Amino acid sequence: MTAKQRWLDARWAFVRAHLPPAPARVLEIGCGPEGGFVPAMREHGFAAVGVDPVAPSGPGYHRTEFEKHQLSEPVDVIVACTSLHHVTDLDEVLARAAEALTPGGVLIVVEWAYERFDEATARWSFDRLPDSGERGWLHSHHEQWLASGQPWDDYLEGWAGREGLHRGDAICRALQARFHTRLRTHAPYFFPDLHPVSEADEQAAITADGIRATGLHYVATRPAAALG
């Protein structure tokens, strides 16, 4: 099983818990080449579609950016999993998400708060990188950080700036400006790339060892009228 599939399997319970009853209409922003949660949502009776420039081919998937996707009708739910920190214009994407939702519709966000990825958390993660098998993004960061000769914080901020990433706290502020917050919490994030480290293992280290939870879970509803 790939790290991506381990991630989707681990986060499906959270997404499923906040979906309204089927057959609600659901759109996933940034479903990726695997289709994100769309297959699982369809299995559970939801009318789910995925939007991503690298979405799978086939019915229900749209190979385009969400900002350019034309909806035929509003949806009941939008799911965004580790996609918002990558978008070019966060405000534009969230404005379109609010427009795409029915009044009272649900927004489910699974994100990464990269600003919480401090050196202690990085070292804990790098110490647990698998020696064989799939080499993922954490392997690359470990190698690039060592090669840079920079302090970790300088390396991380430089990389995030070059990639144009949005901070988790900035994502939350932008969400709160347009939606009614129902839930906001941090969670383990790195375990899928550290197999056989489990989510419980990472949570235990967060609780006992002082590493930081960099995952971000956020659930909100679209108000009947614009906020502010």
Annotate each predicted stretch with a short phrase.
Residues Q144-A174:
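A conserved mid-domain beta-alpha-beta active-site/ligand-binding segment of alpha/beta enzyme cores
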Residues E92-P103:
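A short glycine-rich, Lys/Arg-flanked "PGG" loop and its adjoining helix->strand segment in the class I
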Residues P23-G32, I108-S140:
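Conserved class I S-adenosyl-L-methionine
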Residues D169-R173, A177, R182-G228:
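A C-terminal cap/extension of S-adenosyl-L-methionine-dependent methyltransferases
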Residues V79:
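A conserved beta-strand element that flanks and buttresses the S-adenosyl-L-methionine
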Residues Q5-P23:
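Conserved alpha-helix/loop element of class I SAM-dependent methyltransferases that forms part
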Residues G32-K68:
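Class I SAM-dependent methyltransferase SAM/SAH-binding core
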